[in-house]
Amino acid sequence: MQQQSAHEAAQAVVNSIYRLSPGDKDSPLIIDVSRSGTRYPPEFLPPASFRALHTKISPYVDRIVLPSVAEGATVLMAEFPPTLVDPNRPVDDLDPDCLDAEWPSVLKPLQASLASGSGLVHTLGSDYTPLYQGKLSVTDVERRISDYYRPYHHALSELLAKKREKFGRAFQLSCHSMSSIGPKDGVPRPPICLGDLDGMTAPTSYVDLVARVFRGQGFEVAFNKPFRGNELLRRHASQAKRIYSLQVEMRRDLYLDEATRELNAGLATLQKCFLEIAALIRTAPPA
């Protein structure tokens, strides 16, 4: 893991649900990393191979963003993997056919989640092989929600509320990585994709600031395609309350070899981007 500052090492909160690394300086910026966790709970023992499980995460995104604590960003990272339960999915985005009994409330699985097996609880690996041989128990899925999903969202909500109270505004960057080629359509993806639910979760000035930094390092930036954002933006953003949220998807080959997952020199370039973004947000005058 990226070496921590003395302040971060002293103040970091680590448990089975999340790692919270406070910024070294006062800032309204929260960076959340929800899909890079590698702490597999002992009770999570699907029959799928470790590779099938592990290739569903956004690898090393914490390494990319952690240096930004030096410029005041607070980093919240989920310790658990998204294959256990995915914080970036609505709680009703669950395939009823994967359950051993009727769910106690109405489910509304998204078609894209059904096709990819990547809803609230992932059922397919990155190669579309099943992660489970049988049905999931309703009790087990409810426990994943209560023990992991809800506490992560609660922690993020509290952090944003405190920043909003202190600064009059709060900024959320929800950070992920994506494969360089779309697994279904085979279409090459842009280096960086910024999602704001098509303008719903962030003002243009915030989106432009982030895009400008990435472009300054030579990266092409796309907006809302192939990813426009999901539950982490929908649940926490409120422009009326001045809580501004933006999803950042980074193409994995920018910082690692996708076959071996070995990091490359591009890691430092992306770290520099987040340091600059954090510095600009920390020093920006209130809008």
Regions found by a protein language model. Name each.
Residues Q2-Q172, S177-A287:
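N-terminal catalytic or cofactor-binding beta/alpha core of small enzyme domains
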